Each structure stands twice: as structure tokens, then as C-alpha cells.
């Protein structure tokens, strides 16, 4: 427990003295690439013990054990020598570049071929965009020493560090734009619990960030592991894609900490694939994810999608990917912003028609706006659906802020217990009136598609929460609502014009 409370603070205090570290996001990135090498070195100990002729992809001199640790005389690299080694030897080689002295190659950059085992290939993909921000070799030495104190071959200490790593990920919520990579643990745990994982299934997250959904999935599934065969099924049950380098590094390190060795986590863009080219081999039993919304993608990305599904909103594009990559009889749980529910632009309407008309959208859970605070105050929702049949009816349930809170916050975040009422309701569904509103209600697919015209913003919050939106969030929400209102007006005008004797008004 001492490690949990002291580890992050010790490193933070050292890094604050280094002129190269600018803000929490850089501090965390700096910490995590070193953690990755330390954890990877511990894993290599296991692989060397259990595999015949195991050979590291990292050159011997550049393995953590041979440069980060003190030698037999207690001497360790430090100062300018350490800084020069990290910047001009370690990083270039791990990124795949040769290191030369004159015309002589001193170290070859690590090479990855199509047949390179995933557990080796992740070293290069993890370091492709990693950075060493520290400018002082003495402070760098001090941070390395703190990290090297952790004994990952000690089961109890390794388990305890899992909590430390979770705290590191939570800090991302207040580290500027990096917060977008972190979905609160309560949300990922609830979604994994409700999706009911089964051994033998394969689960995917196409924008996996730090690996929160994957970790929650593994946590639920691990309860079913009783032998080595089942453990292999667990290890093989995940698939993740992350476009951005920093969260990819966080996710891979997260998987190593959870003893997932042949981790199927890929550093690429899920949206850069023709939607209509997916085959059954590209589909999954379960999809759990929080698609990025309000993100920025090159306009060319829309070319990978049919015209009726093309959108500038990344959440819409990911919803289409999910629908095309969910196996027959598969299950999905997805976080979406309010804008997806009420939005009536062409893409959103067509996505919702496909979702309701071809899939079974059985449950929509409304979340309070402060669940993702302080990263965003935009209200989010959880969609639960399966690929078994078209929707006949959809239940909506509103999760309310506890009576003793005004809102959730960084210091008082949402916890799994705040879903207790929803979990109890889930297994015994009933309509719950709330004055002139409803906390829970069910609607037919016909009502959602025709009477509502695909506006499925139902069972919302009767009173605006006392929460001031971030200016960018406010702009984004008003833009969504303006688009929605314009679409509604166009629809009503078209219906009225159709009733006129002469048709369209000139």
C-alpha cells in the first residue's frame, strides 16, 4: 500500500525539477515508456525460463537489465552519458533505426517481419512515436531508480502495482486532451458485467485507448478460468486497435501488467478500411467500446464509407464499423454522446435505421453529464444491442446522480455501486414514472423510427444539471442540435408541401 501512495508522488517530485517536462501529459508519457521496458524485461525473464532458445528482439546491451540497473560495483549510468545513451542509442534502435559510428553500424535497429511474434513486434510499435522529454540525466537516473524498485516477479507487488497503474490512467482525465483516452472504470466494469462474457468468445475495441474495456472484459472472463487451456482462451479473447501512439503505449503496458503476453493490440486507424470489404473473418462475438466523438479525421476517411453512412463525426463512423463487424448473434455495448440520440442528419438517421431495423437495440442507459468530468461534460449514453433480429422494442433507463451529490468529479468519481439500481432493474424490467417524466420506459421500434423520426432522445433528465459545459463542448452540442432542428424542419416542410395541390412552394 505504501508503494501505491508513494510511487507516483516520488516520480512527480523528481520530474518537476526537470526543465524538459511540460505538464502532466508529458510526465505520464515519460513515466510509461520506462515502465514498459521494466515490465517487458520481467516478462522476458519468464519467456527465457519457459521457452527453448528464446531470443530478445532488443539488443543485449539495450535490455533494461543491462543499462538501467547498477553494475556489480554499484555503478550506474547517469548524467550526460545516460541522456546521450537514451536519446542517441536506445530510442533510435527501438524505433527501428541503425546507430552508426562513422560508417560502422554499432547497433542495428530492431526489425519486424510479418512472422515476428506479436510479443516481440510490440516493442517497435510501442516506441515508434515515443519521446524522451527529460533534459537532465541525473533526474532521469533518479526516476529510473524509483521504477526499478518494483519487483514484477513478486506476485503480490505486481498485483499492487496494478492499482498504481490505474491511478496513472485516472490522472489522464485531468491531463489536457489525453483525457479522451480514459473511460471511467465504473462505466467499463458495468458494460462488461452486463455483456456477460463467455470463454471462447472474441471481444474487440476498435478505439481501445488505454485498454479500459479490455481490462474489464478480462476481469469478468478470468472468473471462468480453471486450467491452462482456459487461460489460453482468455489470452486469445481480445482484439484492440488504437490510432494514437501515447494511448497505444499505455494499453500495451496495461496488457503486460495483466499477464496478457501475445497481446492483439494494433497501432493503426480502424476507420482506414473500406466498410463494405469486411468479411465474416473480420467480425467479433462481442464489441465493447467508447468511440471518440468530436474527433478530427482527414476528409478522405469518409471515402471508406458508403455515401449514406459517410459523416464528419467520428462517433458515427465508428458506429458503422461496429455494425459491420459484429458477428451474427454477437453482442455489443457502446458509449455514444447525446448528439447520436437526437441527431437527424443524413448519416445518423441511416445508422439508426440500420441499428434498429437490422439489430436488436434492447437497452439504452442514460448517464449523468458529469460521469466523464473533468474531461467533458457532454452527456453520454450506453447502447446495448445484439445481432440476433431486428428491434421490436427498446427499454430506456436513466441513471440519476446520488441524492447526496450535485455531480461526479475527479475526487468523487462515479463508482460501480452507482449502477446498483440499474442492475436490479435490468433483471426485472418495469416502467418507472418520475412525475411528468419517466426514469424508465419502453418504446416500440415503429415508434422510434416513424413517430420519433429516429430521434431517440427519450427518458432524459428533467432538469438541467448544475454543470457548466466547456466552451468547445457547448459549441459542439449546439451544432448538433442545430443540425437536428434543421433536419426536423426540412422533414415537416416536405410533409406540408406534399399536401399542397401544386406540390412544392416556389
Where do the protein language model's features map onto the residues?
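Conserved S-adenosyl-L-methionine
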Residues: 177-289, 294-296, 312, 316, ...
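A short, mixed-charge helix-start or loop-turn motif at secondary-structure junctions
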Residues: 173-174, 234, 304-305
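Charged, amphipathic alpha-helical interaction segments
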Residues: 35, 222, 256-259, 327, ...
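Helical mechanochemical/support elements of P-loop NTPase systems and associated helical scaffolds
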Residues: 7, 24-27, 139, 160, ...
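Non-catalytic, mostly N-terminal accessory regions of nucleic-acid modification and defense proteins
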Residues: 1-194, 198-199, 266-273, 366-370, ...
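A conserved structural/catalytic subdomain of Rossmann-like adenosyl-cofactor enzymes
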Residues: 267, 278-506
Amino acid at each position: 500500500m505504501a508503494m501505491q501512495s508513494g510511487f507516483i508522488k516520488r516520480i512527480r517530485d523528481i520530474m518537476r525539477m526537470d526543465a524538459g517536462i511540460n505538464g502532466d501529459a508529458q510526465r505520464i508519457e515519460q513515466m510509461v515508456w520506462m515502465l514498459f521496458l521494466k515490465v517487458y524485461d520481467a516478462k522476458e525473464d519468464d519467456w527465457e525460463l519457459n521457452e527453448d532458445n528464446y531470443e530478445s528482439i532488443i539488443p543485449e546491451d539495450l535490455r533494461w537489465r543491462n543499462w538501467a540497473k547498477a553494475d556489480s560495483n554499484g555503478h550506474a549510468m547517469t548524467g550526460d552519458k545516460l541522456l546521450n545513451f537514451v536519446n542517441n542509442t536506445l530510442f533510435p534502435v527501438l524505433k527501428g533505426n541503425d546507430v552508426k559510428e562513422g560508417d560502422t553500424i554499432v547497433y542495428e535497429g530492431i526489425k519486424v517481419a510479418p512472422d515476428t511474434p506479436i510479443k516481440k513486434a510490440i516493442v517497435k510499435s510501442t516506441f515508434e512515436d515515443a519521446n524522451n522529454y527529460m533534459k537532465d540525466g541525473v533526474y532521469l537516473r533518479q526516476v529510473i531508480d524509483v521504477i526499478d524498485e518494483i519487483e514484477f516477479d513478486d506476485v503480490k507487488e505486481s498485483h499492487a502495482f496494478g492499482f498504481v497503474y490505474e491511478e496513472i490512467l485516472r490522472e489522464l482525465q485531468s491531463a489536457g486532451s489525453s483525457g479522451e483516452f480514459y473511460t471511467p472504470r465504473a462505466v467499463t466494469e458495468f458494460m462488461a458485467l452486463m455483456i456477460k462474457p463467455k470463454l471462447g468468445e472474441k471481444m474487440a475495441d476498435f478505439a481501445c485507448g488505454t485498454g479500459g474495456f479490455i481490462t474489464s472484459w478480462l476481469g469478468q472472463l478470468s472468473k471462468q478460468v480453471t486450467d491452462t487451456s482456459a487461460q489460453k482462451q482468455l489470452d486469445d479473447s481480445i482484439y484492440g486497435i488504437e490510432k494514437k501512439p501515447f494511448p497505444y503505449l499505455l494499453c500495451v503496458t496495461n496488457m503486460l501488467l495483466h499477464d496478457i503476453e501475445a497481446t492483439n493490440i494494433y497501432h493503426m486507424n480502424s476507420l482506414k478500411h473500406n466498410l463494405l470489404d469486411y468479411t465474416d473473418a473480420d467480425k467479433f462475438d462481442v464489441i465493447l467500446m467508447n468511440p471518440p466523438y468530436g474527433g478530427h479525421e482527414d476528409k478522405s476517411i469518409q471515402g471508406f464509407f458508403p455515401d449514406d453512412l459517410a459523416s464528419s463525426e467520428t462517433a458515427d463512423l465508428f458506429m458503422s464499423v461496429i455494425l459491420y463487424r459484429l458477428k451474427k448473434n454477437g453482442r455489443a455495448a457502446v458509449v455514444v454522446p447525446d448528439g447520436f440520440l437526437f441527431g437527424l442528419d443524413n448519416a445518423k438517421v441511416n445508422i439508426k435505421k440500420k441499428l434498429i431495423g437490422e439489430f436488436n437495440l434492447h437497452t439504452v442507459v442514460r448517464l449523468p453529464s458529469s460521469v466523464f468530468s473533468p474531461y467533458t461534460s457532454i452527456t453520454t449514453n450506453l447502447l446495448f444491442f445484439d445481432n440476433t433480429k431486428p428491434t421490436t422494442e427498446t427499454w430506456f433507463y436513466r441513471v440519476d446522480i446520488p441524492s447526496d451529490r450535485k455531480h461526479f468529479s475527479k475526487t468523487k468519481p462515479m463508482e460501480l455501486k452507482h449502477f446498483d439500481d440499474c442492475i436490479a432493474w435490468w433483471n426485472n424490467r418495469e416502467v418507472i414514472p418520475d412525475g411528468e417524466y419517466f426514469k424508465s420506459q419502453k418504446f416500440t421500434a415503429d415508434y422510434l423510427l416513424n413517430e420519433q423520426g429516429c430521434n431517440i432522445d427519450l427518458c432524459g433528465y428533467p432538469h438541467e444539471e448544475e454543470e457548466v459545459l466547456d466552451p468547445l463542448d457547448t459549441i459542439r452540442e449546439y451544432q448538433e442540435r442545430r443540425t437536428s432542428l434543421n433536419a426536423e424542419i426540412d422533414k415537416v416542410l416536405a410533409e406540408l408541401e406534399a399536401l399542397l395541390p401544386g406540390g412544392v412552394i416556389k
